[in-house]
Amino acid sequence: MLSGDIPPNQTVYLRNLNEKVKKEELKRSLYALCSQYGRILDVVALKTPKLRGQAWVVFSEITAATNAFRGLQEFDFYGKRMRVQYAKTKSDCLATEDGSTAPKEKRKKQEEKAAEKKRRAEEAQQSGPNAAAQSNGTGYQASRLGKTSQEPPAPPNNILFIQNLPAETTSMMLQILFQQYPGFREVRMIEAKPGIAFVEYEDDSQSMVAMQALQGFKITPYNPMAISYAKK
């Protein structure tokens, strides 16, 4: 599908999305899927009758939006083929950046950002003294190395062990990410152990490709995935 006469810009418009997916899960899944193309400023998905099955993803750079436009066309997302084009109008967050929003809208955005910042600060405080270090991956990797230094890593095999996943991660979110690589079979999560998952491929060469591509990938801005081979 072509984007018609709409010139390339920082926002991609996605349609033919599965309308049964809840809004927050849809936004998280789109963030996880699209952030591999570049830094995301905003994901907009509304559940009003006219806007169901649609979403907008705002990138910081036009090149990132262009890569997403090319890479996600006809992508199988929750069982439906995604349709992608460039957005017709400037997104609110981009308008805020260049100062073209009205003062009232700008103030509202600032208030929302302040509330989000406060919420994340409270979460970090509740998580303990190591939360700040873990948010950029260093604390987590150091603790992981400390725990595994006494035992050798598992040899390459067809099953990957995924750690440091955010609590809201779902099997479908991981499937969307890992099914992009050849040989994908399934995702397994353990309800009693949040934050980890197993991803199976047909053989170890295929699992290696996925591991190298997604090592350190952030499903959210604060959780770099740690991927290793599963122990058998």
From Swiss-Prot:
Keywords in alphabetical order: Cytoplasm, mRNA processing, mRNA splicing, Nucleus, Repeat, Ribonucleoprotein, RNA-binding, Spliceosome
InterPro entries listed in its UniProt record: Nucleotide-bd_a/b_plait_sf, RBD_domain_sf, RRM_dom
Described function: Involved in nuclear pre-mRNA splicing.
UniProt entry tagged with the keyword RNA-binding: yes
Source domain of life: Eukaryota
A single GO BP: mRNA processing
UniProt cross-references to PROSITE patterns, sorted A to Z: RRM
Family: Belongs to the RRM U1 A/B'' family.
Compositional bias per record (Polar residues), positions renumbered to this chain: 127-151
Stretches with biased composition (Basic and acidic residues): 108-123
Tagged with keyword Translocase: no
SMART domains: RRM
MF terms (GO), sorted A to Z: RNA binding
Record note on quaternary structure: Component of the spliceosome where it is associated with snRNP U2.
Cellular compartment(s): Nucleus, Cajal body; Nucleus, Nucleoplasm; Cytoplasm
Region (Disordered): 92-159
Predominant location category: nucleus
GO cellular component entries: Cajal body; cytoplasm; nucleoplasm; spliceosomal complex; U2 snRNP
Protein name per its UniProtKB record: U2 small nuclear ribonucleoprotein B''
Domain RRM: 10-89, 158-232
Pfam short name (any one): RRM_1
